[in-house]
Amino acid sequence: MSQLELETCNLTLVRYPQVAENSALQAWDAADEYLLRELSTMEIAPGPRLIFNDTFGALACGLQAQSPVSISDSYLSQLATRHNLELNGYDADAVTLLDSMADLPDAPALVVMRIPKTIALLEHQLRMLRKVVTPQTRIIAGAKARDIHTSTLQLFERVMGPTKTSLAWKKARLVHCEWAELKVSEQSLTTEWELDGYGYRIQNHANVYSRNGLDIGARFFMQHLPEQIDGKIIDLGCGNGVIGLAALEANPDATVGFFDESYMAVASSQMNVEVNRPQDVERCSFVVNNGLSRVRRDTLQAVLCNPPFHQLQAVTDEIAWQMFMDARRCLQVGGELRIVGNRHLDYFHKLKRLFGNCETIASNTKFAVLRAVKTNSSR
C-alpha cells in the first residue's frame, strides 16, 4: 500500500495481486504523477476522457470525477482499478472499463496514455484512436524516460501526427501529440507463423507474448505434456494457446480451458483453436480471469502452466505463486500441476513445499519441466 500525494487529492493505492507490506513495489510511479500533475493545469473541452494502460488505477482514481473510460488489455489492471477506486471511497462505476478489443467512444476530448512496453500494442492503440479522435482531442502520454525512444516518437508521428516531448521529471517524460491529416495505410497487427511439427498456423494479437515465433520454454514444455487425461485440463496463462492446442491433440477425451488475464491472449487462443482444430472447439472454453479465481475447488484433472516471473517491469514471483495455490485448490486429488520454468527460479522447492511432492519430468541447461500431484495431505 502506498500514498500518491497530489495537489487535488491524496490517493491510497495497492498493487493487484497485493504484495507484502514490506515490499518496495508500489502501485504508481512518477509517470502517473507527472500525467496527473500536467492534467491539473490543462483546460479540457467537454467530451469523453479516455485512459489507456492504467496499470493499477492511479489515473482512473485521479480523474474519477470526470467519469473517464479506461481501456486495458489486462483483467488484473481492471480489478486493481475497481479495488483502488473503492479503497479511496470513490464510486467504482464512475469509471467505465473497456477491454483492448472493444470499440472506442467517438470524438474524445482527452486521451491519457501510459505508453505500453510492447510497441505493437502501442501501434494497435494509436491506430484504434486515429479512427475516433478529432483535431480538438488533447493527447498526452507518459512513461519512464528510459522507455521513450526515438522509435516511440516516430510511431506517434507516423500514425497520429506532430509529436513533442516534455522535459524529464523524476525520471519520467511526457509525450504531447496532435491529430493530423495523414495517409495512414490499413495494416493488421495480427502476426502469423507456422508451428513446426504440428502444421498449425498460429495467429497472435498485438499484446501476446512471443508473437513472432514459439519461445524456447514453450517448445521444451510441449515435448513433455501429459497424455490420455480424461477430465478437465486448464492451460493457465495461455498466451496464444499453443500449450492448450498440443494438450487437445494429446488428450482427445479431455476438455481444455484457455485462461489468461490478457484479453488479447484469450482472443488469440480462441482464434488458433478455431483455425487449427475446429473439430475440438466444443471441447474448449476461453476465459479471461485472475488465475483460477472463478473455478470451483476439486474440479480439475490437470493444470498446465508456463508462469511469468515478472509483472510489468518488476521481477516478482507473486503471480506464479498465486497460480500454484490456485492449482492446488482447484485440482482433484490425484490431479497434477505441470509447469515449465527457468532452472534458476527454483520452482521445485516451492512446489514441494506447497504440494508435499514434486518431480522433475525433464530438464536441460535452461529449463525444467516439473510435476506436482495433489494428495489428501496437500488439500
From Swiss-Prot:
The keyword S-adenosyl-L-methionine applies. It comes from the Bacteria. Disulfide bonds: none annotated. Its main location: cytoplasm. Its EC number is 2.1.1.174. It catalyses: guanosine(1835) in 23S rRNA + S-adenosyl-L-methionine = N(2)-methylguanosine(1835) in 23S rRNA + S-adenosyl-L-homocysteine + H(+). CDD domains: AdoMet_MTases. Keywords: Cytoplasm, Methyltransferase, rRNA processing, S-adenosyl-L-methionine, Transferase. The keyword Oxidoreductase does not apply. GO terms for cellular component: cytoplasm. Pfam families: MTS. It is found in: Cytoplasm. GO terms for molecular function: 23S rRNA (guanine(1835)-N(2))-methyltransferase activity. Specifically methylates the guanine in position 1835 (m2G1835) of 23S rRNA. Belongs to the methyltransferase superfamily. RlmG family. This is Ribosomal RNA large subunit methyltransferase G.
